[in-house]
From Swiss-Prot:
Keyword annotations: 2Fe-2S, Amino-acid biosynthesis, Branched-chain amino acid biosynthesis, Iron, Iron-sulfur, Lyase, Magnesium, Metal-binding
Protein name: Dihydroxy-acid dehydratase
Family that this chain belongs to: Belongs to the IlvD/Edd family.
Residue numbers binding Mg(2+): 78, 120-121, 444
Cofactor: [2Fe-2S] cluster; Mg(2+)
Signal peptide (residue range): none
GO biological process: isoleucine biosynthetic process; L-valine biosynthetic process
Pfam family, any one: ILV_EDD_C
NCBIfam families hit by this protein: ilvD (TIGR00110), PRK00911.1 (NF002068)
Keyword Metal-binding carried by entry: yes
Modified residues (N6-carboxylysine): 121
One annotated GO molecular function: magnesium ion binding
Amino acid sequence: MRSAIIKEGPERAANRSLLKATGVTDAEMKRPFIAVVNSWNDIIPGHIHLNKLAEAVKAGIRNAGGVPFEFHTIGVCDGIAMGHEGMKYSLPSREVIEDTIELMVRAHQFDGMVLIPTCDKIVPGHLMAAGRLDIPAIVVTGGPMLPGYVDDKYTDLISVFEGVGAFRAGKLSEAELERLENLSCAGAGSCAGMFTANTMACMTEALGLSLPGCATAHAVDAKKVRIAKESGERIVELVKQNITPRKIVTYKSFENAIMVDMAVGGSTNTTLHLPALAHEFGLELPLEAFDELSRKTPHLISLRPGGPNFMLHFDRAGGVEAVMQRLSSKLHLDQLTVNGKTIGENISELEIINPKLNEEIIKTLENPIHAEGGIAVLKGSLAPDGSVVKQAAVDPKMRVHTGPAKVYDCEEDAMKSILAGEVKPGDIVVIRYEGPKGGPGMREMLAATAAIAGMGLLESVALVTDGRFSGGTRGPCIGHVSPEASEGGPIGLVKDGDLIEINIPERILNLKVSEEELEKRRSVFNPPEKKVTGYLARYQRAVHSANTGGIVD
């Protein structure tokens, strides 16, 4: 056992003395020491229940003969951080979370770990730590929130964000907006659609790092507590067998995850998190892999924000394993998972509890919602190194569009203009200097995109940015434009009125300005320098481009 280095032999008497001060007995000294890495806190709805899941995990560890030690990581709620300076700290928190887990685990020489995250950057931070440390690990994602129910229809956080735009457009009264505010977020769990947190939970299960059914088991469901307890039991077996994450996750596992991502219409943030995760596993996952697999993998389930269904429906229809059943002819079925079985074995054992809903919600390869997957990678003179769009959430009318640019150098300026009615049908909103270095922190533009949606402009206005989007964004919103403006990318050269060409089927994002004119602009181009201090200053110096996953050296 790894933990022998802190607890065996006469020279470790002082170490044992400190462990005994915490209540560890002599008998427990002989058992595996398991870290329970909990991201519980009081401010993130997706995390307010994780203390209860941690107790279930610890009970499972004890049942199996291990000794649990719980510690906590930080977490940022992207929804609360949205639309202001706080969002600059969301993506950078991913690496901080990873680093703190590494520090705790290496310092205390745990034999294995159970990771308990829920929300957007916290799940990838935990996964990246698993890849870097490569000790036996299993992930228990916290589970989705139940949807709200207002005016005889299901609602979620995006309903509220879009309600702000509708209110500003005079389509919603203040009382109606307040009703949405009060009733749309039902309690514990990650926001109720296929947004970033739930997408990453699905990626975790598809990679084989959580038990079957974990991704869609809801936060308030007793099934989630049972999965947590079973995960605690299972980690002790993984330690005994020395099955580590790098023995489970291979390049083929990432291909499986991307195919699931495409089938469920997942968040564009996977194009940041999966390459960064692959990097920690010693693998290279290029942006082009997403587009290649998207062309081969149809979109099979229509979930919020791009469709009418919620995670609740997805879970009842069979969840991730049910989608993998549909994709079985395309997947690498021989890939191992943390329960000791292969993907193929797991999906062959899946019992569909609600067959009618399963058929209704999860389409077949022969009869998909869209022939291609949820995400497309666009390139061209505006994005030489690539950009991404959630094509599953784009109205067919806007998949091919050319329009004049309205340029803003930060999200706040764009938001004011949108809410003031200055953005007109046909316009392409350009928000720049919001990339990993330029922000710094690569903020999500959900407030702006939700305002566009709420004001009824989804079918006539596009948005292009070197920032990124919430998993809740819908419409012709193209992000991760690389190189970013602060790195001298062409997006920094765009002027009001320039024509921009968007062609999603052809994967094109072009700035319709002559090379001669661009050279003139480039010769006098001087990106503004943003003075930042503290962690953001260190992050700005070390972060790489979005097309590499925004990894940090």
